[in-house]
Amino acid sequence: MKVLITGGAGFVGTNLTIELLKIGHDVKIIDDLSTGLEQNVPKDAELIMASILDLEKLHKAAKNSDVIVHLGARGSVPRSIKDPVATHNVNSTGTLNVLEAARANESHYIFSSSSSVYGSNKALPKNENMVLRPLTPYAASKMSGEALSLSYSNSFALSVSTFRFFNIFGPWQRPDHEYAAVIPKWISKCLAGDEIEIFGNGEQTRDFTYVTTVVQVIVNCISNKVLHPEPVNLAYGNNISLNQVVGLLKNTFPTLKVKYLTPRNGDVLHSENDPGLLKRLYPDITVDEFENSLQDTIDWFKNLP
């Protein structure tokens, strides 16, 4: 199949591209490289350096696509608080643009939303029927993308699959970006012998999901055309506190030091998914233990040139 990945030069996109090429799909990527890296794009994938806000280049890239995986977004909660308009433009208007491209080509459209849409809803574990209470412009923009995707399924019979990503980590994730995720940032600090920082007391929990697991689910969704326009939470209920992550890192970096800082505005205290729907739709997915996945990620970073 011909697959277009928006944001395909990013972390999840790179891992997904590698796997799709391995099993014989044709992959095209559109990415403005604002956070993605050109050198991460496999040579057998075609890269179009453009924003999803560029309608002409987007529609050209999407032409004849069987599947469009929409990963492109302006990520990060703090970044959205700093510039909410830019976040809205890319994540809401940009998503509308990608939906139009999918509709024009009758593509299977796969959308990546975020668990941040639950926001101030403190009930745990999260399930897909809970009330959404976004705390930040980023979360609101992802909620908007979900609604748009569902509306295109209902209004235009577009084949839609929507996932809510939780805290994904693994190889190819950038540690050096201003808004880098916690695990790659911490591993990079550990390798450099620097102390790591935690906003809050470290007892906040996250349902970390290894990127290989996410890729398995998306590939399964593509191969079997699993349609579910209502969002599906993509995490397996393996929540762990940041202090527990630190404890595991100390197995490899015993001299690791931690500095605790004031909590950040907009950060959710606890995140844990109820994977019931995910397991029913994707029963054959293999989920690695967090400790093993974390060690694999450390080893990957250690082997970087």
Regions found by a protein language model. Name each.
Residues 38-39, 78, 123, 187-188, ...:
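Short secondary-structure boundary/capping segments
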Residues 13, 141, 179, 242, ...:
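Hydrophobic (often cysteine-bearing) scaffold residues that line and stabilize catalytic clefts
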Residues 191-305:
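C-terminal substrate-binding subdomain of Rossmann-fold SDR/epimerase-dehydratase oxidoreductases
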Residues 35, 171, 236:
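Short, conserved catalytic or interaction motifs in soluble domains
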Residues 56-59, 78, 85, 96, ...:
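Residues in well-ordered alpha-helical elements
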Residues 123, 150-206, 211-220, 247-252:
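NAD(P)-dependent short-chain dehydrogenase/reductase
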Residues 1-166, 297-300:
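N-terminal Rossmann-like NAD(P)+-binding domain of SDR-like oxidoreductases, especially those catalyzing
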Residues 98, 149, 186, 278-279:
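Structural element of the ATP-grasp superfamily
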